[in-house]
């Protein structure tokens, strides 16, 4: 193993991935070759002037000229780019065994047990390779268990790139995808109290009674869909939603919303599937999972997870109850060639260990509180900031042309992220149904100095734009 480790250069330099800098070719050359060989529909950040990564370390990325950038985008690299403990765990397992899951491995069971220790009420895990796979499998589980076909999703939802999950994703089928909304998918209003169907006034956004009432209205919308589906002699297998909506604009649902929806869905024989692919493993700070945010007793029937759990290594999973898992496929078993392989499981175990050893839940909570204070102060100064919403290290800044009308300002959002990159070395992304939400979802090692740097730069950019 030491020969492999030395050859890869993982532990021979104090700078992670230092070996990568020895083979950095011009961005122009790589982009030309990319255009010739990679599908034109493969998305890329900063498409007019793509960012080329030569190496990465913790919360920083380095371009082809070794310029350093603060990464506020990469929630996948959960505990930090090339975190040495994760790199070590992956490297050791890679040099030990990569045998698939039809052999018995301690890593598979250890990994499943550790995940389940954070999910009360669930007792079974099935492994996959991506969030898209996990969400596809979750729907199959729900259908096989309930014997129903239909699904309820929420506006602007994104659940993956495979055909089934694109059919579950208004984020795709409402925006020109060749995959259209099927008859069995029903779209409920997004529980967004700032832009949604049951929006609140600015002075009501922190009013608990108003938030509860809005949440009740949104859950009643789901109840209406369930009644309509049943009236047509159909059945809903599952309500499917992200715990906190990410691509849809960093939306935090009101307290008790999921709990009330669960009552309605289960009364109609369906299951609750919560997609934690973007928000799990401590990003929200207070809890390990975003659906646990409110401590309201809500327990999903199925939880899907992916992105952060491998810190960049491909791995995902579905957690559920044994009786649901046992219904999968009838007489046909479940096998996934790479899902749950020992290297992937080693990555997950090491990520969870780093989260614990480095107190990253507490750190994310503390950084989130400091970030909120800084962003609220920024909102008071800049009229273009219509709303600030988030928790832990999961935040959205809603940019508007006018606070009264809340008209989204896509042009400003795009100009802002370009200016932050060019002049300040800060990488942010804009998303949401109107592409006007600045998303802050960095690696969890993001610190107080990073917050100050980001907010100061954002303040200066908006000031220069007279906004």
From Swiss-Prot:
Enzyme nomenclature, EC number: 4.2.3.-
Coiled-coil annotated residue ranges, if any: none
InterPro entries: Aminotrans_3, Aminotrans_3_PPA_site, PyrdxlP-dep_Trfase, PyrdxlP-dep_Trfase_major, PyrdxlP-dep_Trfase_small
Source taxon at top rank: Eukaryota
PTM-bearing positions, type N6-(pyridoxal phosphate)lysine: 307
UniProtKB keywords: Lyase, Pyridoxal phosphate
Cofactor: pyridoxal 5'-phosphate
Major enzyme class: lyase
Signal peptide limits: none
Listed CDD domains: OAT_like
GO MF annotation list: lyase activity; pyridoxal phosphate binding; transaminase activity
Membership in a protein family: Belongs to the class-III pyridoxal-phosphate-dependent aminotransferase family.
Protein name per the record: Ethanolamine-phosphate phospho-lyase homolog 1
This protein's encoding gene: eppl-1
């Amino acid at each position: 193993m030491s020969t492999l480790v030395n050859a890869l250069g993982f532990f021979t330099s104090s700078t992670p991935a230092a070996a990568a800098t020895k083979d950095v070719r011009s961005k122009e050359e790589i982009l030309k070759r990319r255009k010739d060989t990679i599908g034109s529909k493969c998305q890329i950040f900063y498409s007019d002037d793509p960012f080329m990564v030569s190496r990465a370390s913790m919360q920083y990325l380095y371009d082809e000229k070794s310029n350093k950038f603060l990464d506020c985008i990469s929630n996948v690299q959960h505990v930090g780019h090339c975190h040495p403990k994760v790199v070590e765990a992956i490297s050791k397992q890679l040099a030990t065994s990569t045998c698939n899951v039809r052999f018995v491995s301690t890593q598979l069971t250890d990994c499943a047990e550790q995940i389940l220790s954070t999910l009360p009420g669930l007792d079974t895990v099935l492994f996959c390779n991506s969030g898209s796979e996990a969400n596809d499998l979750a729907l199959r589980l729900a259908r096989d268990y309930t014997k129903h076909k239909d699904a309820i999703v929420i506006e602007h939802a994104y659940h993956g790139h495979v055909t089934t999950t694109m059919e579950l994703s208004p984020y795709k089928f409402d925006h020109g995808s060749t995959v259209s909304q099927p008859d069995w998918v029903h779209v409920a209003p997004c529980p967004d109290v700032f832009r949604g169907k049951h929006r609140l006034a600015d002075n009501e956004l922190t009013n608990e009674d108003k938030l509860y009432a809005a949440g009740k209205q949104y859950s009643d919308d789901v109840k209406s869909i369930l009644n309509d589906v049943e009236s047509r002699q159909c059945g809903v297998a599952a309500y499917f939603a992200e715990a906190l909506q990410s691509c849809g604009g960093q939306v935090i649902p009101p307290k008790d919303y999921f709990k009330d929806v669960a009552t309605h869905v289960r009364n109609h024989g369906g299951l609750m599937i919560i997609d934690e692919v973007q928000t799990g493993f401590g990003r929200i700070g207070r809890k390990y999972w975003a659906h646990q945010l409110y401590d309201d007793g809500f327990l999903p029937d199925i939880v899907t997870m992916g992105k952060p759990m491998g810190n960049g290594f491909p791995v995902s999973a579905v957690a559920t109850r044994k009786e649901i898992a046992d219904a999968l496929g009838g007489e046909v078993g479940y096998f996934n060639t790479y899902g749950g392989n020992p290297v992937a499981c080693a990555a997950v175990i090491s990520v969870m260990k780093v989260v614990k050893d480095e107190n990253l839940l507490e750190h994310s909570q503390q950084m989130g509180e400091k970030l909120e204070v800084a962003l609220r102060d920024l909102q008071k100064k800049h009229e273009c900031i219509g709303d600030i919403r988030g928790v832990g290290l999961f935040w959205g800044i809603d940019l508007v042309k006018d606070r009264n009308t809340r008209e989204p300002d896509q042009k400003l959002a795009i100009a802002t992220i370009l200016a932050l990159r060019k002049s300040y070395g800060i990488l942010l992304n804009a998303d949401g149904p109107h592409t006007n939400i600045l998303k802050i979802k960095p690696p969890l090692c993001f610190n107080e100095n990073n917050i100050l740097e980001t907010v100061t730069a954002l303040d200066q950019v908006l000031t220069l734009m007279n906004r």
